Each structure stands twice: as C-alpha cells, then as structure tokens.
C-alpha cells in the first residue's frame, strides 16, 4: 500500500492562509482558494506521507475522524493518482465532503501518528487538504454529480437542523 517512509522523504506543506486583516472582514474560507488541478501535484505528494499505520488513529471515531472516514485508503489512492476511486472511498463514509472538508476542525490530523513526534516526522499528514482536493476535483471532473431523488413517493419528512447532520439525514431520506 503506502510508502512507510514517505514522511521522511517528503516535507509537510500546509495550505496557504489568507491574511488575517482580510479574513476578519468577511466569512469566506481561511485558506486561499486554488484550482484543485493546480494543487493536485502537491496533494499527491502529501498523500504519499501517509504511512498506513498498523492502527490508524486518524479514522478512529474516538480520537480522529468522527465520521470514520477511510483516510489511509483514500490517501493511498490519491498517492497513486486514482482520483475517481479516492472519491468513491471518501463518499462511502461522508455524504458531503465538499463542505465538511472545509468546516471540520480536522481531529484526524491531531490523531495522525506522525503528529506525535512532529520534530522527527515533520508533522501530521495534511488530511484536510487532501479531502478538500478529492471533493473539489471530483466535482470539476464530473466524477460526482447532483443526485436528485429518483422518484417522488408523495410522502414528506421533516428534518430539524440545517447543519451537516441534518443535511445528511435529509439526503438519506430523499433517496
């Protein structure tokens, strides 16, 4: 699967943040927007830093990803340039990675084994950035498309809440 020494060969590269003076005046993203195809090369390398640990705490619901995203799996697929398969693995556990990947505080990166000894390892894998790129590229390349309900049953369901959990519940009831 992954190169277990990739983190030793490839330095961690963080996404560029917008200047603070600019960010305090709006509600836009903290990070600079960049075309996913432009950042794909960087993200391929960063995914190669994942060492596919024996016990990947990054996707454990107690310490890492609360959704249980299959992070080592899609990191390896991205590393090999298999964006369509990476998107499939990401969507297997996450209905809306295109916005959860931006809103999430990324406990997966804190739980990453490489974050334990940051000075020696260079820090955690940039999981959040990789997830954003998978989702963005999937939309731009037509791998993911809007999915309207196949048929209308005529029934109505009320979902309280417009956050990610409410939207995921509504999405599962619509299909």
Where on the chain are the PLM-derived regions?
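N-terminal Rossmann-like FAD-binding beta1-loop-alpha1 element of flavoenzymes
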Residues: 155-175
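Ferredoxin-type iron-sulfur electron-transfer modules and their immediate structural context
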Residues: 1-156
């Amino acid at each position: 699967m992954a190169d277990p020494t990739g983190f030793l060969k490839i330095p961690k590269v963080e996404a560029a943040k917008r200047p603070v003076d600019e960010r305090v005046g709006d509600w836009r993203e903290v990070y600079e927007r960049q075309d996913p195809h432009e950042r794909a090369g960087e993200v391929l390398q960063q995914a190669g830093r994942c060492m596919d640990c024996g016990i990947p705490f990054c996707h454990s619901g107690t310490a890492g990803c609360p959704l249980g995203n299959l992070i080592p799996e899609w990191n390896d697929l991205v590393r090999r340039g298999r964006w369509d398969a990476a998107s499939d693995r990401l969507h297997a556990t996450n209905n809306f990675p295109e916005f959860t990947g931006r809103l999430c505080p990324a406990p997966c990166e804190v739980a990453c084994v490489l974050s334990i000894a940051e000075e020696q390892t260079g820090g955690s894998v940039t999981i959040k950035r990789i997830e954003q790129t998978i989702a963005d590229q999937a939309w731009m390349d037509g791998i993911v498309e809007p999915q309207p309900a196949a048929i209308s049953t005529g029934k109505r369901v009320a979902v309280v809440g417009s956050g990610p959990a409410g939207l995921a519940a509504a999405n599962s009831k619509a299909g």
